[in-house]
C-alpha cells in the first residue's frame, strides 16, 4: 500500500453495485491511516453508496469530481 503522501488509485470503471463498495472497503482495511484513495467509477449508484459506506466507517465524505467517463472520489482514510 502507498504512503500517506501518495494517493492509491482504485479503478472500478465498469463495475456495478456492490463491487465498488466492497473493493473500497477492502482497500480501507489495508491502507495506512491518513492515506488518500482516488476511486474512478461510473456506476451512478456510487454517488450514494460510497458516501454512505464512509459515514458508516466514521470517515469524512468523499470529494466527488465529475469526469468524462464517470466520477473521481477522493477518500481520506
Task: Give the role of each language-model region.
Residues 7, 34-38, 70-72:
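Intrinsic-disorder/low-complexity, polar/charged segments enriched in Ser/Thr/Lys/Arg/Asp/Glu/Gln
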Residues 64-77:
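C-terminal edge-of-domain segments
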